[in-house]
Regions:
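N-terminal localization/anchoring segments of enzymes in phospholipid and broader phosphate metabolism
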Residues: 1-348, 352, 356, 396, ...
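Short glycine/threonine-rich loop-to-helix capping motif typified by GTGT followed
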Residues: 376, 402-406
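Helical hairpin unit composed of two closely spaced alpha helices linked by a short loop
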Residues: 367-389, 393, 398
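Phosphate-/nucleic-acid-contacting segments
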Residues: 360
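Thr-Gly-centered strand-to-loop micro-motif
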Residues: 364-365, 392, 422, 441-442
Length: 509
């Protein structure tokens, strides 16, 4: 009689998440205890640890790396001279673990020629757009394409029916890559189609971030999917160990159907993204659907990750687009960024849009935790007369990060940037749109983790009709927002001190 409730209780208590959290917490406590016990009274060891911290600081000063990240660690080491150097060695080096880096770089090098820029794709662009496109094509490398139709979605529930319809039409393959999967209405609708298509012989593959999906999936998820002939890779699996490897997450959102249709944006496969579940009020997001030549970039992105961990294809040509739209609509350029190299591609795209803007830049971002370079770019654009508007959430999902975001408001307002908070709920979209000339829609937040630690993706639009669609979405959204004034940014002395500490440590959050 009581057996089933007892089993459910024990399953809830002794699940993977609980065990992982408890073991990691115990390791942290043990390491701290061992550190203080071992160093107590040992002058030579204290001196050695301080010397290590000094050497780490000197190394950071010379290192060619984002200044905000370096300053954050230097401050932390200054506050904790004994522990700071050791913490940096354990957690501070943002290069991925050796096995992760070697596997992915090997595949990317082999297939670099798959992403060569075809001639004549950007000839009709203005010089500013052409220069940005050339940069992404060279240092991504992700080429730009003319023969691509795009459609912008202003929320997840608008995108979802079209996504299901495209999945239903799959004949050859379906590739999905997401940060968050969570059981519920949205995932169930997708899963039913995936199971049916896999049974029909369609090649169905799924990559999901193990950390992002840790709370949302049953422990036997991979086994169940593989039995249904849906092949799975949990990216960078979470293990109950204190490890730098856990820093690097797959934050991308990608769907590719038959090489002809692709989706990306901020929408994950969980119910809040289509407002089937209310977590922080109304969930405002954005996504984009591509059809045509530019889908190839997303196909290669996915296959590179897949073949790094489950080597299968040496030739990607079988997955190339076979259907192109009849009408050309500007230029479309999907791109990805990762911590595998020292090229800050995602940040540079945002900085370039700001620096080249002449009339306006409208920005959706759920978080604002940026370095001085990005902060200066926002202020400089506003100071030269560009209409710069930032739209952020009114209801936060992370209160400390929300406090950090607000700590940037006053200097931006003083420079002339206009800031809005989306009062109906949480704004999760990540978009830039400028001058009716260029736009970016993707998974990339304006914070250090997205810009430098995570695997991310986005789509650049040049002189495309959906740039106007994004601008109109912003214009419809602004009346639902509260504009922030300087008077809203007043705080007391403890609040100012907290904001200062958060700003200093923002690269570490």
């Amino acid at each position: 009689m009581f057996r089933l409730p007892i089993v459910k209780f024990f399953n809830r208590i002794f699940n993977r998440v609980t065990i992982t959290v408890v073991l990691v917490a115990l390791q942290v406590l043990w390491l701290l205890w061992a550190f203080w016990s071992f160093t107590a009274g040992r002058v030579w060891l204290n001196g050695a640890l301080k010397a290590l911290s000094i050497m780490i600081v000197l190394y950071l000063v010379r290192k060619d790396e984002n200044s905000a990240y370096k300053i954050g660690w230097i401050v932390l080491i200054g506050l904790l001279p004994l522990l700071g150097g050791a913490l940096y060695l354990a957690f501070g080096n943002k290069a991925p673990a050796k096995y992760l880096r070697e596997r992915m770089q090997k595949v990317e090098q082999v297939h670099q020629t798959e992403l060569a820029q075809p001639e004549g794709q950007t000839d009709a662009l203005d010089i500013s757009s052409r220069n940005l496109s050339r940069y992404v094509a060279k240092f991504g490398p992700y080429p730009a394409w003319k023969d691509t139709a795009a459609h912008y979605f202003s929320c997840g529930e608008e995108m979802y029916p079209q996504l299901l319809a495209d999945l239903e039409k799959a004949e050859k393959f379906i590739f999905l890559e997401f940060f968050i999967l969570r059981s519920g209405k949205m995932w169930d609708g997708v899963e039913q189609i995936l199971r049916r298509k896999a049974a029909q012989g369609v090649d169905v593959r799924l990559i999901y971030d193990d950390f992002g999906s840790l709370l949302g999936l049953p422990s036997d998820f991979v086994i169940r999917m593989e039995k249904a002939h849906i092949r799975c890779i949990p990216f960078n699996p979470v293990v109950p160990l204190v490890s730098l490897v856990m820093n690097h997450r797959d934050h991308r959102k990608i769907v590719v159907v038959d090489g002809n249709v692709a989706y990306t944006g901020g929408v994950n496969l969980a119910d809040e993204y289509i407002n089937a579940e209310q977590r922080f009020g109304y969930w405002k997001d954005a996504a984009i659907r591509l059809e045509g030549a530019a889908v190839w970039n997303f196909t290669v992105m996915f296959l590179n990750v897949w073949n790094a961990f489950r080597p299968q294809e040496t030739d990607y040509t079988a997955f190339a687009p076979t259907r192109l739209p009849a009408v050309q609509d500007g230029v479309v350029q999907p791109y990805a960024d990762s911590p595998l190299d020292e090229e800050p591609l995602a940040e540079t795209v945002y900085l370039d849009i700001l620096s080249q803007a002449q009339r306006y830049v409208y920005i959706y971002t759920p978080y604002l935790a940026v370095g001085e370079e990005m902060l200066d770019a926002l202020k400089s654009a506003a100071k030269r007369g560009v209409d710069v508007r930032l739209i952020l959430p009114g209801i936060p999902d992370k209160k400390l990060v929300f406090r950090l975001s607000r700590s940037y408001y006053l200097p931006l307002l003083r420079a002339g940037v206009r800031i809005y908070e989306f009062t109906p709920g949480f704004l999760h979209a990540k978009c830039y749109v400028s001058d009716d000339r260029v736009a970016a829609v993707g998974s990339i937040n304006m914070d250090y983790r997205s810009l430098f630690l995570h695997f991310e993706c986005g789509t650049l639009l040049f002189h495309n009709s959906q740039i106007a669609a994004l601008r109109k979405d912003v214009e419809r959204t602004l009346p639902q927002c509260r504009e922030i004034m300087r008077s809203d940014c007043r705080t007391n002395l403890p609040g100012t001190a907290l904001d200062s500490v958060l700003r200093l440590l923002s690269p570490l959050m």
